[in-house]
């Protein structure tokens, strides 16, 4: 363990996790995260996503300020895009990410899976790898019948 280390001596990803853990210990009804995925590897992102889903499932409000649209698509039902203090879009991830001009104004990109599904010419737009694989596998299974 690192329980005896000064938090300032920890790596950035460890400090972020420590900060999240300390806020979780307070058991608040609202959690605000500012760029929680910065300095996180895949496992850290998965842990943070799991925490967010768990809190949401318990009726807690999780607000996150993010530029990582893949993480947003994987973990949040409602998305609000802001730029220069103005709300540009508010809706489900699919609704918001379908608004090209809004994304351009906010200097954001669609999630990579959404970009890929559009580049491949799929009629349906996918937000997550899991969603794409599930749908494509069911199409393959239907063709085999």
Show where each model-derived region lies.
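ABC ATPase nucleotide-binding domains
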Residues: 103-145
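A short, surface-exposed alpha-helical micro-motif characterized by mixed small hydrophobic
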Residues: 72-74
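H-loop/switch region of ABC-family ATPase nucleotide-binding domains
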Residues: 66-67
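Catalytic Walker B motif of ABC-type/P-loop ATPase nucleotide-binding domains
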Residues: 31-34
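Conserved ABC nucleotide-binding domain
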Residues: 1-8
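ABC ATPase "signature
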Residues: 90-91
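Conserved ABC ATPase "signature" C-loop
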Residues: 84-85
